[in-house]
């Protein structure tokens, strides 16, 4: 499995962050991740299609909001809190 690409903290752009948060589904993902330290994609999907959730997680990763790592066959997500402060 390919590792996920995450932009370095120095490359975070406010407009991308705000765009990522402008979608209600992505905002909900971020809010739920703020309540826990880490969660799998399945724990955050809310019954939505996997393809839609993959898109939303990619937008959040590209904006620098979320860190995703593979643990076996599960993708675990966490907020990049320190990079966003």
Name each region found by the language model.
Residues 1-13:
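A detector for short, charged/polar N-terminal pre-domain segments
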Residues 1, 57-61, 77-78:
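Short amphipathic alpha-helical surface micro-motifs
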Residues 12-49, 71-83:
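N-terminal helix-turn-helix DNA-binding core of bacterial DNA-binding proteins
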Residues 6, 55-56, 75:
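Histidine (H) residue identity feature
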Residues 42-68:
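Canonical helix-turn-helix DNA-binding module
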Residues 66-67, 83-85:
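Extended, hydrophobic interaction surfaces within ordered domains
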Residues 1, 16, 52-54:
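Generic intrinsically disordered, low-complexity segments enriched for polar/acidic and small residues
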């Amino acid at each position: 499995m390919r590792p996920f690409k995450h932009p370095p903290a120095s490359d975070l752009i406010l407009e991308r962050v705000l765009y990522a948060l402008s979608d209600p589904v992505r905002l909900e993902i971020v809010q739920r991740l703020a309540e826990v330290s880490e969660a799998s994609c399945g724990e955050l999907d809310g019954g939505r299609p996997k393809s839609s959730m993959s898109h939303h997680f990619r937008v959040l990763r590209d904006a620098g909001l979320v860190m995703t790592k593979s643990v076996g066959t599960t993708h675990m997500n966490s907020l990049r809190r320190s990079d966003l402060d």
